[in-house]
Structure formats: structure tokens, C-alpha cells
Amino acid sequence: MRHSKSGRKLNRTASHRKAMFANMAISLIEHEQIVTTLPKAKEIRPIVEKLVTLGKRGGLHARRQAIAALRDAGKVAKLFDTLAPRYASRNGGYLRIMKAGFRTGDNAPMAVIEFVDRDVDAKGAVDRARAESAANEKEASSL
């Protein structure tokens, strides 16, 4: 019987789920909005909300716990320095899930998960910077 079993398996092994959720959390912290399937969005929300709470707590131990979960010190720095102060006055509910229709191909329910009061410029900022630097290098090499 399945009584009192929490969480979804998502047709993956435990190690695959753990790695996938860590990667999704990193992407969500970096871009502040991602598009994924609805079950994955529902599973990632409590993970990232606990990480934001760790960021609000501050301190060395909380930072080390976040690094252990995310495996990316740069994103942990953003979590503690940018996101935690932004949500200092909010007690939970840092993320929102919006349904986004169905995926073409397999008709899977899709969702957009994003931070409440997110920075709109954060989405795609890394890609824009990468494209801009590539264009600058191309100009410099052509001169």
C-alpha cells in the first residue's frame, strides 16, 4: 500500500532525482523563472523555498548546507546576497507555479515556476552577456 508515501518518483532513480532537482534549483536561482513539467515544478518548489529560508537564516552553517544541496558556490552567493534580502519580510511562499498548457509531442502538462517579485532582467541575462562578449571578440578579431 502507498499510504504515507510523500514525493513523486518521476520515473527516475533516487540519485537521478537528487541531481535533477539540484540542477533545476540552480537554474531557478540563476534565471528566477523556468519552464518545466507540472509534477517537476510541484516537487522543486519546497526544495527551493527551504533554500531561500536557509539564505534568510544566514550564517556559515546555513551557507554550507546550501552549498551541499546546490553544489554551486556562485548560485549560493546569489541566494544569500540577493534573494534572501529580497524576501526578508516574507514568511514563505517565495515561488509561484503557473500552468502553461500542454507540451507538443507527448501532451505533458507544463508549468512556469518563478520567484514572486522576481527580477525580470535576470531571465536570459547570462545568455545576453555571452552573446555580447562573443560579438565584441568578433569585432576585435576583424579589426
UniProtKB/Swiss-Prot annotation:
GO terms for biological process: translation. Pfam families: Ribosomal_L17. GO terms for cellular component: cytosolic large ribosomal subunit. InterPro entries: Ribosomal_bL17, Ribosomal_bL17_CS, Ribosomal_bL17_sf. Keywords: Ribonucleoprotein, Ribosomal protein. Belongs to the bacterial ribosomal protein bL17 family. This is Large ribosomal subunit protein bL17. It comes from Bartonella quintana (strain Toulouse) (Rochalimaea quintana).
